[in-house]
Amino acid sequence: MIQTIRIGTLLRETVSSPYRNLVTRPTGAAIRNRIQAAIADSDCHTALLDFSDIELLDLSCADEVVAKLLLDGPDRGTRYVVLGGLREDQNEAIEHVLTTHRLAVAAMPGGEHPAPRLLGWVTADGRAAFAYLCERGTALASELAGGLDWPAARAEAALEGLAFHRLVHTDGDRYQLLPVG
């Protein structure tokens, strides 16, 4: 199951302001705390953070909300985070802070046929493996190796890197994209 957390709603409830700008570190920390509480109270395995009602996302809030939420990894247990409703300028802010922390997240663009996009620090092999999974939905390491003409160890390392960053789900052998719909 997927839990959708509307960041715009959290912002309005947290700062009691009509503005749709997510700026300042204290505001970002307050929003992150609300997200963490919502995730902790949910039985869902995937949280979709919906930024569609946010107009401005500055670097400090991208760091506080997204990077620090991902750094909180062990406390998330088996839960995953996916971003949605981002505009290009917001993608850039999040990409910058995640790359700095060597973190990554999957983002779902809007549109009729959205394909997930990786934001942050991911190796070239990881990006190629993610693109392969986007086309097929699921794969064994041996299938990825055959599909990309890679040695088995290279395919396994790329998929394990994606799983480590919680960008894909694995049952031990098969890797798949996170459910977001």
Where are these regions (language model features)?
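Domain-start "cap" segments at the beginnings of catalytic or binding domains
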Residues: M1-T24
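Amphipathic alpha-helical interaction surfaces in cytosolic regulatory modules
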Residues: Y19-T46, F51-L103
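Short helix-capping/hinge SLiMs at alpha-helix to coil transitions
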Residues: A40-D41, L133-G137
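Short acidic, hydrophobic short linear motifs in intrinsically disordered regions
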Residues: L48, E135-L148
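Short alpha-helical segments that sit at the start of domains
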Residues: T100-Y132, A157
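Short, cationic-aromatic polyanion-contact patches
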Residues: T123, T170-G181
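Short amphipathic alpha-helical interaction segments
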Residues: D149-F164
